[in-house]
């Protein structure tokens, strides 16, 4: 099997506490021909020194320091500077299994496709782990992949736990200034493919943080989820009419998700009555 250069993009912003664990998992990958791109998005903690140290330690690490532009801007910056034939994302407060890249590349080449997906574990603060992985892999049509994503079945909208051929990004970028940027983008990358490989083993470790933007309580920018979901549903229904029911269900789910967060805001009932 060939071993082309694979670029792994990490958007870095004030993650000094978590970065060492993440980088240890990447520097120890069984797939060696890597370009590890650290995009320091204007960090104000010790990330600058850590990133520079990793670049001195391992020639595969490339560091870019830029003014803060947000997660989407950092991801786009990484893609635009990547030299690899394939691109993967890892969030710096998570970590990956040692064969994360090897596994994604293996199933991608096995089915000769442009994108592959693996499963992930969720690690909670109490030490519990939500593990849903199993053995096996398969090749599916784009329509089937989108359907499963819309139903939260094996595939989700996250940028990570996926390997992309770089050509998929020719006309696709993450929306700057928005949260839920993955919802607005991952389906577009899928729609650039002919077919997609799905691996059922968990190779990515997502660390649940209650204070993260997505997991925190309701703020007005959480409404970005509805906008992103509606746009996604509109585009999917236009190209794949057979997925209309799944797309509408996802739109309903997005609204209930935001409503539940709003109801948890202290004083919401009083604000609503006014």
Per-region residue spans from a language model:
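Short, charged, amphipathic alpha-helical segments
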Residues: 244-250, 272-273
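Amphipathic alpha-helical repeat scaffolds of TPR domains
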Residues: 249-261
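A structural signal for alpha-helical segments
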Residues: 220, 242-243, 270
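Membrane-interface aromatic/basic loop that binds lipid-linked glycans or pyrophosphate carriers
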Residues: 265-274
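Nucleotide-sugar donor-binding/catalytic module of glycosyltransferases
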Residues: 1-234, 238
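Secondary-structure edge/capping motif, primarily at the C-terminal ends of alpha-helices
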Residues: 236-240, 262-266
């Amino acid at each position: 099997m060939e071993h082309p250069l694979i670029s792994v993009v990490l958007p870095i912003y004030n993650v000094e506490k978590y970065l060492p664990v993440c980088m240890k998992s990447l520097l120890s990958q069984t797939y060696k021909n890597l370009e590890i791109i650290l995009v320091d998005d204007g960090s104000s903690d010790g990330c600058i020194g850590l990133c520079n140290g990793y670049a001195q330690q391992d020639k595969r690490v490339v560091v870019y320091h830029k003014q803060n532009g947000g997660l989407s801007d950092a991801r786009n910056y990484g893609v635009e500077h990547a030299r690899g034939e394939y691109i993967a994302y890892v969030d710096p407060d998570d970590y990956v299994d040692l064969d994360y890249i090897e596994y994604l590349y293996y199933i991608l080449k096995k089915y000769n496709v442009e994108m592959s997906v693996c499963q992930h574990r969720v690690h909670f603060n109490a030490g519990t782990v939500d593990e849903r992985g199993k053995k096996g892999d398969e090749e599916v049509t784009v329509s089937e992949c989108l359907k499963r994503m819309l139903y939260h079945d094996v595939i989700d909208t996250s940028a990570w736990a996926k390997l992309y051929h770089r050509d998929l990004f020719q006309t696709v970028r993450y929306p700057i200034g928005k949260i839920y940027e993955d919802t607005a983008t991952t389906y577009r990358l899928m729609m650039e493919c002919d077919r997609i490989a799905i691996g059922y083993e968990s190779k990515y470790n997502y660390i649940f943080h209650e204070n993260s933007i997505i997991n925190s309580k309701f703020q007005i920018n959480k409404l970005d989820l509805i906008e992103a979901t509606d746009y996604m549903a509109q585009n999917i229904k236009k190209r794949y009419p057979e997925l209309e029911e799944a797309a509408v269900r996802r739109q309903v789910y997005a609204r209930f998700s935001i409503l539940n967060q709003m109801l948890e805001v202290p004083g919401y009932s009083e604000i609503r009555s006014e």
